[in-house]
Design a protein with these regions (language model features):
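Short loop/beta submotifs within extracellular cysteine-rich repeat domains
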Residues: 49-51, 76, 92-95, 122-124, ...
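Detector for the c-type heme attachment site
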Residues: 44-47, 67-75, 117, 121, ...
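Bacterial N-terminal signal peptides
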Residues: 9-18
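Electrostatic cytochrome c docking/interface patches
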Residues: 23-61, 101
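Bacterial N-terminal signal peptides that target proteins for export
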Residues: 1-10
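Extracytosolic ligand-binding ectodomains
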Residues: 158-166
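C-terminal capping alpha-helices of c-type cytochrome domains
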Residues: 38, 107-122, 129-159
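Gly/Gly-Pro-rich "capping" loops immediately C-terminal to redox-active cysteine motifs
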Residues: 53-111, 130-137
Length: 166
């Protein structure tokens, strides 16, 4: 448990330091460790730190983003459906990305929120119908979830496939 707290605190510090050096208004804000813990619980289980099940368009209970996108956010394939990488460096790549043959621009915090809650990508297109619309998130829970997503990208930033063009 103590190791997990050290990891989360270190990840939060890394996110803070990396965002503090940027002058872009579209950069992501750093988030506190307690908020990261709530975001992690939502991501992993679909349940808030207060024990509230987050409602979604598929009526799933006790499952979160990790069920499809994986614990590291890198996606893959689930039941034959391609599941995209949702790490922040991938989503915010200024070159955009192509998924399912459709190119989209880079995401920012607001477009990530739209993807999570409304199922709309950064180009204004509907996401795959299998992507649940997480309608039961409070504004704080949504910010906490995005804060946790930032740690997934921060931890992976040095990996070989992420080093190109960042």
């Amino acid at each position: 448990m103590a190791l997990r707290r050290v990891f989360l605190a270190s990840a939060g510090l890394l996110v803070f330091l990396s965002s503090a050096t940027s002058g872009s208004s579209q950069e992501f804000r750093p988030w506190l460790a307690s908020h990261l813990e709530n975001g992690q619980r939502i991501y992993m289980s679909g349940v808030t730190a207060q024990g509230r099940v987050v409602q979604n368009s598929h009526g799933m209970e006790g499952v979160g983003c990790a069920m499809c996108h994986g614990p590291d956010g890198r996606g893959g394939t689930m039941h034959g459906i391609p599941v995209p990488n949702i790490t922040v460096p991938f989503l915010t790549d200024p070159r955009g990305n192509e998924h399912n043959g459709r190119k989209r621009p880079a995401y920012n915090e607001e477009t990530i929120k739209a993807a999570i809650v409304a199922g709309i990508d950064s180009g204004g297109n509907a996401l795959h119908p299998e992507m649940p619309r997480w309608t039961g998130l409070t504004a704080r829970d949504l910010d906490d979830l995005i804060g946790f997503l930032k740690t997934l990208g921060a931890v992976r930033r040095g990996s070989p496939d992420m080093s190109q063009g960042l």
